[in-house]
Amino acid sequence: MADSTDEVTAVPRMMVDIETLGLEPGSAILSIGAVQFTEDGLEEEFYAEVSLESCQEAGLEIDADTLEWWLGQDDEVTGILTGGDDLTHVLDEFRLWFPDDAEVWANSPSFDCEHLGVAFDAVGMSEPWAFYDERDVRTLKSLPGAANVEMEGNEHDALDDAKHQARFVVETLQNLDSAARTGVDA
């Protein structure tokens, strides 16, 4: 019989991060970054940039203040504003990549998962996770034993952010597990 730790680690864990042109659900999505992770580290990655035109055609909106903020960023970051693939194609590819019955982690699900849910609805698809599989990185940040993980890559790059958040979760869960095994406060 498997112990509860084996059962928990058997569930695929996916970290998701998006970049958008607005803070409200229904905003245009610029990019989706995601990475599968286990207690041992990062695994498969997903990254796609989304065409703003296809977002608008699907009914997603562009917030002028957020667009202005993006235009004030480094050239390396603002390149995301042009090009990209069709929203429907990107979301379909994401659904195909996303494993069944996986936990979806985000910082925070009320932003990333909700925005993605609205985008999936806009193109007539359902998101590839159930609401009860959403996990919040912010909860772990508030716990004793939360890891201090240095950012690698670029902030506001959806894949770099997803990988950073996943590394944080992996290290924090390792810290908490170690503390539980030794009976010491993390």
Report the location of each language-model feature.
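Short, flexible loop segments at boundaries between secondary-structure elements
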Residues: 128-148
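Anionic group-transfer/hydrolysis microenvironments
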Residues: 19-21, 35, 108-109, 114, ...
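Conserved non-catalytic scaffold segment of RNase H-like nuclease domains
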Residues: 2-14, 19-106, 152
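Acidic, Mg2+-coordinating catalytic module of metal-dependent nucleases/exonucleases
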Residues: 103-109, 114-115, 146-186
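Hydrophobic positions within alpha-helical membrane elements
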Residues: 22-24, 141, 166
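Residue-level signal for well-ordered alpha-helical scaffold segments within enzymatic catalytic domains
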Residues: 80, 93-96, 114, 118, ...
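Substrate-recognition/cap helix-loop segment adjacent to the acidic, metal-dependent catalytic center
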Residues: 95, 110-131
